[in-house]
Amino acid sequence: MDKKVYQCTVSAPVNIAVIKYWGKRDVALNLPTNSSISVTLSQDDLRTVTTASCSEKFENDTLWLNGNAEEIFANKRLRVCVEELRKARLDLEEENDDLDKIGALKLHVVSENNFPTAAGLASSAAGYAAFCEAIARLYDLPWTPTQLSRIARQGSGSACRSLFGGYVAWEMGELHSGADSVAVQVEPVENWPEIRVAVLVASAAKKGVSSTAGMQATVASSTLFQHRIQNIVPQRIQEMKTAIRERDFETFAKLTMTDSNQFHACCLDTFPPIFYLNDTSRAVIRVVENINATAGKTIAAYTFDAGPNAVIYFLEENSEIVLNTLYAVTKNAEGWSKQYGSSPVTVDSAAANIVSSGISRVILTRVGNGPRVLTIDESLIDASGNPKFIGSH
């Protein structure tokens, strides 16, 4: 008889921080120097799909990411996640004789992103969230997203926030073990579904300084950073939670922009300095300022992670003015599904020229839900447990 292949397929979302995570107090456990808050983006537009499978016939624990195979145990972060999840399954099997004995079987995990990996679009967050969610579901672990977030965090810090939809906080915790450094939902999508998002991709090339290396250089050398984590972020976390709960966009927007600016100031204060923003990024900031000046209030907010791509938040009710303006300066970029009308905003001409030539792709999305379990039809492995390689989307 052919040996059975057990499998489960999930998708997980990208999240974009509005109060930034940057810096570890414990590198091995991925414990952060400060708490952070993010918005989960809709999986209709950006997602990682992962199938986790196990079988007696598999010889090695293997991950295929976008078609490239790697041994799971050769990657320390993947290995830590698998070891913890496997131990939890084996414990369940020891407690309950009726369970299939799958915990000790080798894993085949296949994962695909529908966006460029390592291009500043938080691919590791969605990737590790999907990886941990798929294996936890395969193993039928009776865990809450917060419990699973402790494991996902050890793969990629920001991944713990992709286990929830809506608005999510990664609480830094206090314990040396990291047991209390977990993600919690601040509010579900339903509390504030009107948030819209425009991602302006400035470069799909791999960034110069990786987040992992960059953040530890900042921790080691930036005096501004110490002020940030001790005196600024704790209050901002509380203010941001209140703004989200009260659906107060102006406060949400101001906190988002000032926190992005301070994060990049800390990068600049690192020695030697780290430059994630480029001329295109700075020009996008000008465009957002022009939009808000014309509106007479803050209706759009920019934020940048460890790369030049801009993420712009706005409310559905202001979509027309925001998108008409962005379209006017990026109409040659890929991703626009229709033409937009004229905008009342006068954009600084130098900024408009830089944005026009510097933005290659636009992704329009919105706040979205947490990981989904997908059907067998969407599985990335065939009946024998090998990748289908359906190709990139």
From Swiss-Prot:
The biological process GO terms on file are: farnesyl diphosphate biosynthetic process, mevalonate pathway; isopentenyl diphosphate biosynthetic process, mevalonate pathway; sterol biosynthetic process
Record's subcellular location: Cytoplasm; Nucleus
Q: Which InterPro entries match?
A: GHMP_kinase_C_sf, Mev_decarb, Mev_diP_decarb, MVD-like_N, Mvd1_C, Ribosomal_Su5_D2-typ_SF, Ribsml_uS5_D2-typ_fold_subgr
Q: In which pathway does it act?
A: Isoprenoid biosynthesis; isopentenyl diphosphate biosynthesis via mevalonate pathway; isopentenyl diphosphate from (R)-mevalonate: step 3/3
The name under which this protein is listed is Diphosphomevalonate decarboxylase
Enzyme class at the top of the EC tree: lyase
Q: What does it do?
A: Diphosphomevalonate decarboxylase; part of the second module of ergosterol biosynthesis pathway that includes the middle steps of the pathway. Mvd1 converts diphosphomevalonate into isopentenyl diphosphate. The second module is carried out in the vacuole and involves the formation of farnesyl diphosphate, which is also an important intermediate in the biosynthesis of ubiquinone, dolichol, heme and prenylated proteins. Activity by the mevalonate kinase erg12 first converts mevalonate into 5-phosphomevalonate.
The protein's UniProt keywords, in alphabetical order, are: ATP-binding, Cytoplasm, Lipid biosynthesis, Lipid metabolism, Lyase, Nucleotide-binding, Nucleus, Steroid biosynthesis, Steroid metabolism, Sterol biosynthesis, Sterol metabolism
Q: Which GO terms describe its cellular component?
A: cytosol; nucleus
Q: What is its main location?
A: cytoplasm
UniProt keyword Lipid biosynthesis present: yes
Q: Which family does it belong to?
A: Belongs to the diphosphomevalonate decarboxylase family.
* Residues that hold (R)-5-diphosphomevalonate according to the record: 21-24, 77, 156-161, 212
For this protein, the record's SUPFAM superfamilies field holds: GHMP Kinase, C-terminal domain (SSF55060), Ribosomal protein S5 domain 2-like (SSF54211)
Gene name of the encoded protein? mvd1
One GO term in the molecular function aspect is:
ATP binding
Which EC number(s) are documented for this chain?
4.1.1.33
